[in-house]
Structure formats: structure tokens, C-alpha cells
């Protein structure tokens, strides 16, 4: 079988931060294990990129995640509701270069399924 990890961007970057700053604690060790899973699994699904609070640390964590997985030739799916222009405002040129150069963009069109469900329930 294949090892797959799914995480929202915000939660993944929180795990990176916890692993670094709470090293030695039970929470820090659990976070470090999650980070290793994100870096080493066969397929990582990073959901909702761009919804996290953008900090120097979250940007560093994103770079580490993307670059490490590319170096290890591991598959990664990144979902976002951000346009390319929004991503350019949020992230560094190094991150954007990797995303634009190494990933295939698959735009989704149509209405938001959550809005459709809400309308049906009303």
C-alpha cells in the first residue's frame, strides 16, 4: 500500500512550529512525527493553501515541505482557492517558482458545492 497524509495548510504549518518550539515535550514529539509523515509519505495532500496566517515561520514551513518532497520525488497535491496573483502576494519567489514549475494547475469551475447545499436546505 501507499502512505497518504491529508492536512490543511494551517494545521500542517502549526505542526512544523510545534515540532520546533516544543521540542522534548509530548506535544512537540507528536508534532515532529506528523512533520516526518508529511515529508516522507508517498502522497501528501495539502488543503486550503493561503487560508493560514502568513508568517515568516509558515512561509519557511511551506518551503521546507515543498522542497523536501520535490527532492525526495514524493507526490503532492496542493489545493487553494487563491489565484496566482494572490499566491504571488502571499509567498516568496522561491516558493512560487517551485509551485508554478513543478505542479500542474487543475482549475475547477462551477458553483461552490457548499453554497448549493445551503440553498437546498433553505
PLM region spans:
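Short glycine-rich substrate-engagement loop in P-loop NTPases that contacts/grips substrate
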Residues: 2-40, 56
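Loop/turn-to-beta-strand initiation segments
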Residues: 2-3, 40-44, 72-78
Amino acid at each position: 500500500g501507499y502512505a497518504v497524509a491529508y492536512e490543511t495548510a494551517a494545521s500542517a504549518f502549526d505542526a512544523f512550529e510545534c515540532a520546533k518550539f516544543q521540542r522534548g515535550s509530548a506535544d512537540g514529539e507528536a508534532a515532529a512525527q506528523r512533520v516526518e509523515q508529511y515529508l516522507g509519505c508517498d502522497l501528501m495532500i495539502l488543503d486550503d493553501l493561503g487560508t493560514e496566517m502568513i508568517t515568516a515561520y509558515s512561509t519557511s514551513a511551506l518551503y521546507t515541505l515543498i522542497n523536501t518532497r520535490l527532492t525526495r520525488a514524493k507526490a503532492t497535491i496542493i489545493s487553494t482557492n487563491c489565484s496566482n496573483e494572490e499566491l504571488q502576494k502571499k509567498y516568496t519567489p522561491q516558493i512560487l517558482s517551485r509551485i508554478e514549475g513543478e505542479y500542474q494547475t487543475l482549475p475547477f469551475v462551477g458553483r461552490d458545492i457548499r453554497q448549493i447545499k445551503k440553498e437546498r436546505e433553505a
